């Protein structure tokens, strides 16, 4: 979970087999798990799709196949990568990628870029200087420092 620069609370959900989600969290809403999902149970049994339950909140974005998200963070730097100020980043373990998203401040989001890192990325954080730090999910793992070229 992470708060956007505009104060919205967002969360990423590592779903079942398929159906990872990005949700805008709002008071009183039910986001469906385990009642609905865009994925299936690991044993192959289907889970009802969200459109079958209009009383439950649908995700803003969902992934099939999965990205296996590790975490979500919002970039607030204005020196190292000023063009990303206010953007969200989601680490991808299943896609071995770093994923950038643009949030509109009104409950909407869209995918902007996906960079294949070739490693399962568990976590991404902004450093004090505005660079990015990624944590590889491996044994042994590694810290990957992202700076401009």
Label each PLM-derived region with a short phrase.
Residues 1-110, 141-142, 146-149:
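Beta-propeller domain segments
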Residues 107-128:
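Conserved blade-ending motifs and adjacent loop-strand segments that build the rim/top face
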Residues 123-149:
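Blade-level signature of beta-propeller repeat domains, shared across WD40, Kelch, NHL, RCC1
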């Amino acid at each position: 979970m992470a708060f956007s620069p505009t104060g919205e609370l967002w969360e990423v959900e590592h779903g079942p087999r398929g159906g990872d989600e990005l949700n805008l969290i709002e008071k009183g809403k039910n986001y469906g798990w385990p009642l609905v999902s865009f994925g299936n149970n690991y044993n192959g049994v289907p889970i009802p799709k969200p459109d079958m339950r209009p009383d439950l909140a649908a995700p803003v974005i969902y992934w099939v196949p999965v990205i296996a998200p590790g975490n979500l963070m919002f970039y607030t730097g204005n020196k190292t990568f000023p063009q990303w100020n206010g953007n969200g980043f989601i680490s991808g373990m299943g896609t071995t990628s770093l994923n950038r998203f643009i949030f509109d401040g009104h409950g909407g989001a869209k995918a902007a870029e996906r960079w294949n890192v070739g490693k399962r990325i568990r976590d991404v954080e902004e450093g004090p200087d505005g660079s990015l730090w990624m944590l590889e999910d491996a044994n042994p793992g590694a810290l990957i420092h992202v700076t401009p070229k």
